[in-house]
């Protein structure tokens, strides 16, 4: 594990736009509403066996929160929130229950890792799901233009090997994109502008953390 101090926050992907850098070049960015979050629990190595901080984000009607979750928020002394996530840190002593976590934690951060749920595409064929070339458009091909093709042997081995790329459910997976550059931090609006695309749909929940690999070597 690297010696980089890991910081993290929960946020909502708002969509993509573009900005201009210092040299007037167009930079595509994803706008993330990062926080504000609140610390609902601090895990320590002595009690829990590891160091982590639990943060909560998003408003929710208290009547829609079940009793176990309601009790958890009440114990922390905070109002109920819609989303909860746990961020592993090297040292959790700097956090306190009830403390606010805002986008300001990324003021001195250049690169981040973003985790979200990728767009779901439902049941998809081999060409869409894996980028297969497909088969010939003519010359004897009959209703098999987009089929996968051969998937293995015959009597030997008598089965299809595990991991064979075939048609199936595509997307809706937890995905992490690493070493994305922070283009801008807007503390007044709780917005984080990240260069490039991040996983998920507009309005999807994402976890933004300090890049564990330290960012690109520039």
From Swiss-Prot:
The alphabetized UniProt keywords are: Ribonucleoprotein, Ribosomal protein, RNA-binding, rRNA-binding
The GO annotation for biological process reads: translation
Q: Which GO terms describe its molecular function?
A: rRNA binding; structural constituent of ribosome
GO cellular component, as recorded: cytosolic large ribosomal subunit
Extract the SUPFAM superfamilies matched here. Answer: Translation proteins (SSF50447)
NCBIfam families documented for this protein: L3_bact (TIGR03625)
Q: What does this protein do?
A: One of the primary rRNA binding proteins, it binds directly near the 3'-end of the 23S rRNA, where it nucleates assembly of the 50S subunit.
What does the similarity note say? Belongs to the universal ribosomal protein uL3 family.
How this chain assembles, per its entry, is: Part of the 50S ribosomal subunit. Forms a cluster with proteins L14 and L19.
Q: What is this protein called?
A: Large ribosomal subunit protein uL3
The primary gene name is rplC
